[in-house]
Amino acid sequence: MTVQTSKNPQVDIAEDNAFFPSEYSLSQYTSPVSDLDGVDYPKPYRGKHKILVIAADERYLPTDNGKLFSTGNHPIETLLPLYHLHAAGFEFEVATISGLMTKFEYWAMPHKDEKVMPFFEQHKSLFRNPKKLADVVASLNADSEYAAIFVPGGHGALIGLPESQDVAAALQWAIKNDRFVISLCHGPAAFLALRHGDNPLNGYSICAFPDAADKQTPEIGYMPGHLTWYFGEELKKMGMNIINDDITGRVHKDRKLLTGDSPFAANALGKLAAQEMLAAYAG
C-alpha cells in the first residue's frame, strides 16, 4: 500500500502565518544521507588562507499571499562544499550581515549522514557565533587572508543579502583582488548587491536555481506561496548570464567565479572549488 504524503505546507508554530515545506516536497527533495563523495586531497593546503562564508541570518521570507516561508541556508548547499574545502586544507570563518546566528533549513539536514553531521557539529559554533560582515569588510585589504568568499544557497539568501552594501563591498574586494567567489542555487542572489554601484561581475556566466523552477514550487507545497520577485531576472538585468534553465547538478567556472545550480550540485561544486583553490594556493 502506497502512503500518500500531503502537499500542504506544514505550519511553523514559531511565527504567525509561517510554513515549512510539505511532507511531499520533503520526501522528494531531501534525504537523511547526502551524496558526499570524492573527498580525496592527498596534498592539502597548509597555509594561512581561508574561506569567508557569508551566511543567512533571517528565517522568514514573505510570499505573494502574505504567508511566510520558513527558510535559511540549505544544509547540503552549505556543508558539502565546505566539507571538500576543509578536507583540502582550507579553514573557514562565518559572517552574517547582523552578526547574529546563521539560520539553516534544518528540515533539509542529512541527519543520518555519518560524515556530514560530525562535520556540522564540529563547526556549529562558527555558525552560531558568526562575525558581523561590516567588521570583516572594514578589515579587508590586498593582503587579507581570505582566499574565497562562499555564499551558500537556500531561500534565506534572498533576504537582506541582495540589498547589503557590506555584501557588495566584500564581493568587489574579492573580484578586484583575484580571490575566488563560490555560490550555488539561490546564493547568487547576493550578487544583486552589486547592481546599484560598481559591478565587477558584469558579463560573467553562472549556474543558479532557475526562476521557472521557483515558480513551480508552490504547487507541491515547498513554499506556501509564490515569490514576490525572481532573482534570475534581476541578475540578467545587471549583465550576468545564467547558463542553465533546468536542475541537473551542473557546475560552472567563469574565471574565479564558481557556481552550481542546486543542492544536487553541492558535492560537485565542493570538488571543483577544492581543486581550483589547491591549484591556485598549493600548486
Curated annotation (Swiss-Prot):
GO terms for molecular function: glyoxalase III activity; protein deglycase activity; protein homodimerization activity; thiolester hydrolase activity; zinc ion binding. GO terms for cellular component: cytoplasm; cytosol. Optimum pH is between 6 and 8 for glyoxalase activity. Significant inhibition of glyoxalase activity below pH 5. Optimum pH is 8 for aminopeptidase activity. It is found in: Cytoplasm. Optimum temperature for glyoxalase activity is around 37 degrees Celsius. Optimum temperature for aminopeptidase activity is around 43 degrees Celsius. The active site is at residue 185. The keyword Chaperone applies. It comes from the Bacteria. Keywords: Chaperone, Cytoplasm, DNA damage, DNA repair, Hydrolase, Lyase, Metal-binding, Stress response, Zinc. Its main location: cytoplasm. The glyoxalase activity is inhibited by copper and zinc cations, activated by ferrous cations, and inactivated by thiol-blocking reagents. The aminopeptidase activity is inhibited by iodoacetamide, dithiothreitol, EDTA and 1, 10-phenanthroline. Binding of ATP at high temperatures induces a conformational change that reduces HchA surface hydrophobicity, interferes with its ability to capture substrate proteins and inhibits chaperone activity. Changing residue 185 to A: Loss of glyoxalase and aminopeptidase activities. Disruption phenotype: Cells lacking this gene show a loss of glyoxalase and reduction in aminopeptidase activity. They accumulate methylglyoxal and are more susceptible to methylglyoxal than the parent strain. Cells exhibit growth defects above 48 degrees Celsius and accumulate higher levels of peptides than wild-type. They display increased protein and DNA/RNA glycation levels, and exhibit strong mutator phenotypes. Its EC number is 3.1.2.-, 3.5.1.-, 3.5.1.124, 4.2.1.130. Consists of a large A domain and a smaller P domain connected by a linker. The thermally induced motion of the flexible linker-loop region leads to the uncovering of a high-affinity substrate-binding site that is essential to capture nonnative proteins at high temperatures. According to some authors, HchA exhibits an exceedingly weak proteolytic activity against bovine serum albumin (BSA) and some peptidase activity against small single amino acids conjugated to a fluorogenic reporter. Another report showed that HchA does not display any significant proteolytic activity but displays a physiologically relevant aminopeptidase activity. NCBIfam families: PRK04155.1. Belongs to the peptidase C56 family. HchA subfamily. Protein and nucleotide deglycase that catalyzes the deglycation of the Maillard adducts formed between amino groups of proteins or nucleotides and reactive carbonyl groups of glyoxals. Thus, functions as a protein deglycase that repairs methylglyoxal- and glyoxal-glycated proteins, and releases repaired proteins and lactate or glycolate, respectively. Deglycates cysteine, arginine and lysine residues in proteins, and thus reactivates these proteins by reversing glycation by glyoxals. Homodimer. This is Protein/nucleic acid deglycase 1. It comes from Escherichia coli (strain K12).
